């Protein structure tokens, strides 16, 4: 059902079973796929694609221009996957030409009120962003990350899978997977054991990650030495992912 007060461009592609509430504005070249519900006063701008089964709450703004002074109206996009919940006043900006040109959001994410996803961000799946969580431009977020309220991530940072970011945290560097980060200049505060247990990590896998965590963050060893010991003494795919994340970091890691 489409409310009579909604303004929908003739070149927007809206699947027949999409619900659109009152006073929504949907611009040209927007794609909205089946089963999605768009509540009142939502603005979706040109070049946005929204997948199946999403629920978008009032006053969300998706696909707006990037907050980048070099942007001159180029044709860039926002791609949003399936089954996402996007709450009130969320803003998701389109990409920039000098970035990837696309801002991407995966599947099954819960993006709470006033959260912001800036230009060229790549957000994975099963991510939770609490109220006012903010991602600056070019941030990459892996799957199953949780952001507390009012946290902020610096441009070009990466957040590893299963990380937990506490509320009011400022993130100036990459956050490795599986850890808890907190503080105005984020520091590691342990392994995210509760999150790992909820996602069926075995006791043995968690124990190995704890050993790696202690070497990385609770020893006085240089980072390269810690990584060398981990690679020589610890095994498993999660260890490999942890080491690969750290060794490919360009900004350095929170430590």
Predicted regions and their residues:
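Structural signal for interior beta-strand "rungs" in well-ordered beta-sheet cores
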Residues: 1-182, 186-187
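Terminal amphipathic alpha-helical/low-complexity segments used for targeting or macromolecular assembly
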Residues: 1-5, 10-11, 16-17, 53, ...
């Amino acid at each position: 059902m489409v409310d009579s007060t909604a303004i929908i461009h003739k070149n927007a592609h809206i699947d027949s079973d999409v619900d659109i509430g009152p006073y929504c504005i949907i611009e040209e070249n927007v794609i909205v796929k089946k089963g999605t519900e768009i509540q009142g006063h939502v603005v979706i701008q040109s070049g946005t694609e929204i997948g199946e089964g999403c629920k978008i709450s009032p006053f969300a703004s998706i696909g707006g221009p990037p907050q980048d002074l070099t942007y001159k109206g180029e044709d860039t996009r926002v791609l949003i996957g399936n089954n996402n919940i996007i709450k009130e006043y969320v803003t998701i900006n389109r990409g920039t030409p000098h970035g990837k040109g696309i801002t991407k959001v995966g599947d099954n994410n819960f993006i709470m009120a006033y959260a912001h996803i800036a230009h060229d961000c790549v957000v994975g799946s099963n991510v939770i962003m609490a109220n006012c969580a903010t991602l600056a431009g070019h941030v990459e977020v892996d799957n199953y990350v949780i952001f507390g309220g009012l946290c902020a991530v610096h441009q070009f940072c990466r957040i590893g899978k299963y990380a937990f970011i506490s509320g009011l945290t400022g993130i100036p560097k990459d956050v490795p997977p599986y850890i808890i980060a907190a503080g105005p200049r984020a520091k590691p505060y342990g392994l995210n054991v509760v999150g790992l247990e909820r996602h069926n990590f075995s006791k043995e896998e968690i124990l190995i990650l704890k050993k790696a965590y202690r070497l990385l963050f609770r020893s006085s060893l240089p980072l390269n030495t810690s990584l060398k010991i981990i690679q020589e003494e610890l095994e498993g795919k999660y260890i490999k992912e942890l080491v690969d994340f750290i060794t490919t970091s360009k900004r350095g890691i929170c430590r």
